[in-house]
A protein has these predicted regions:
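Amphipathic N-proximal alpha-helical interface segments
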Residues: 99-123, 163-200, 254-259
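Residue-level detector of short, conserved catalytic/binding motifs and their immediate flanks
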Residues: 13, 177, 251
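Short glycine-rich, low-complexity/disordered patches
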Residues: 92-95, 146-162, 224-238
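Hydrophobic transmembrane signal anchors and adjacent membrane-proximal interface regions, especially
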Residues: 71, 90-92, 100, 156-161, ...
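Preferential activation on post-signal-peptide N-terminal prodomains/segments
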Residues: 1-149, 165-167
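Glycine- and small hydrophobic-enriched segments that form the cores of compact globular domains
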Residues: 133-181, 187
Length: 259
């Protein structure tokens, strides 16, 4: 009997502790929700004061620290891609500014030091006849040319397919390739791309991407009447003064008029 009483007391204590913890958790969740709701209302008022609005579906993302990353240019990968597109008999020309141009009887491919690429080559397998076939053909081309990206996504408009792919699990807002299938049996490639694995420098530089600050700064530069739909933290690929490719932390903010 004595043990039964002790057991009941212990169970009661455990229930009381659990109820306390549950109540404390609920209170904190309510506090966080109230704080987020208050911040959302304040931001909407401030953006409205700038002459713009936030879409009803807009949600402010969390602040994040992103390290500055570097990329080594791979001339070997550039040449391999060009050789598949143009054939083994292509000629290679390199200019002083780092531009490398490949040319054959089938077309041309030009890579620039900042990661930009453009070219024209024959369409493998013939011209697709609808958007579904265009996506399928583009994915096949990117894969065969060594230009497929891990976690890539695709958008199609007519016979133009755009591939985007993240780096280090973060979007790179200007890293994309567009492949357009032409009626004459050729394909036109354009965009900005990178190969290899990014890495940090010894200094480990980076940026605190503060969403509210970036949003208000952006809103102050908008034309009156624009609606902000979303914002995403990520990178922008660019070349530094030493001609090294870098991934610079930045926000992409989408409105109803521009990206």
């Amino acid at each position: 009997m004595q043990w039964d009483k002790v057991k009941n007391v212990l169970i009661g204590i455990l229930l009381a502790v659990n109820l306390f913890l549950l109540g404390n958790l609920g209170f904190r969740l309510w506090q966080n929700y109230s704080r987020a709701s208050g911040l959302d209302a304040d931001l909407r008022a401030l953006v409205s004061g700038c002459g713009s609005t936030l879409a009803d579906s807009f949600r402010l993302p969390e602040d994040v620290f992103l390290p500055e990353l570097n990329l080594d240019r791979s001339r070997a990968d550039e040449e391999n891609a060009a050789s598949v597109m143009l054939g083994a008999d292509m000629e290679r020309t390199e200019l002083e500014d780092g531009t490398v141009r490949f040319q054959s009887g089938d077309g041309t491919v030009t890579w620039y030091a900042d990661g930009r690429v453009n070219g024209v080559c024959p369409i493998p397998g013939g011209t697709p006849d609808d958007e579904t076939a265009a996506i399928r053909a583009a994915r096949k081309c990117f894969s065969e040319w060594g230009l497929a990206g891990d976690g890539a996504s695709y958008q199609v408009s007519g016979f133009s397919v755009t591939q985007t792919a993240p780096v280090a699990n973060r979007p790179v807002h200007n890293r994309e390739l567009t492949l357009t299938f032409n009626a004459d049996g050729t394909a036109t490639l354009s965009g900005t791309w990178s190969f290899g694995t990014p890495y940090t420098t010894v200094t480990g530089r980076g940026a605190d991407c503060r969403a509210a600050d970036a949003l208000l700064q952006f809103a102050s530069s908008l034309e009156a009447g624009e609606t902000i739909r979303s914002m995403t933290a990520g990178y922008r690929m660019q070349m530094d003064s030493s001609r090294r490719l870098q991934l610079i932390p930045t926000w992409k903010i989408v409105t109803d008029r521009t990206d």
